Amino acid sequence: MRMSTTTEIIAHHWAFAVFLIGAVGLCGLMLLGAYFLGGRAQARAKNVPYESGIDSVGSARMRLSAKFYLVAMFFVIFDVEALYLYAWSISIRESGWIGFIEAAIFILVLLAGLFYLVRIGALDWTPTRSNRRVSKPSTVRYASSHPQDISQELSVAGSQQANESR
């Protein structure tokens, strides 16, 4: 006598379903326990970063370049690929020539991705140069740091621009 498909699926996968329900239930139980048993003190300095007993100076937030995040993502990607190559190198005798060809194709795809990243400049850390050109290099002057000199230079530059526009 043959079982129906739903009964067959339940018979084969009941252990996984019990495991999944148990894992989700345990996570929920721990979250609820932390919510009910956790402290709720609201002090003035609760959210202030601790700096070895010294009063904090400035903000703890730093703006980082997006290139750092790109490098982190590239590291994770190439690290996972190295993991796959390590698994292949352990089973090289069992995989034979077919496994070698597949690993060679995998390495070629990695190299193509690396060359693409280099080509689009994702790994270039030098600052980009501005394409702006100064129209009249003779009018460029070094400004003084004294406030009176700066205001005089601005008024002279404004009158020169007004004369040029006429």
UniProtKB/Swiss-Prot annotation:
It is a multi-pass membrane protein. Keywords: Cell inner membrane, Cell membrane, Membrane, NAD, Quinone, Translocase, Transmembrane, Transmembrane helix, Transport, Ubiquinone. GO terms for molecular function: NADH dehydrogenase (ubiquinone) activity; NADH:ubiquinone reductase (non-electrogenic) activity; quinone binding. Its main location: membrane. NDH-1 shuttles electrons from NADH, via FMN and iron-sulfur (Fe-S) centers, to quinones in the respiratory chain. The immediate electron acceptor for the enzyme in this species is believed to be ubiquinone. Couples the redox reaction to proton translocation (for every two electrons transferred, four hydrogen ions are translocated across the cytoplasmic membrane), and thus conserves the redox energy in a proton gradient. NDH-1 is composed of 13 different subunits. Subunits NuoA, H, J, K, L, M, N constitute the membrane sector of the complex. Belongs to the complex I subunit 3 family. This is NADH-quinone oxidoreductase subunit A. It comes from Yersinia pestis.
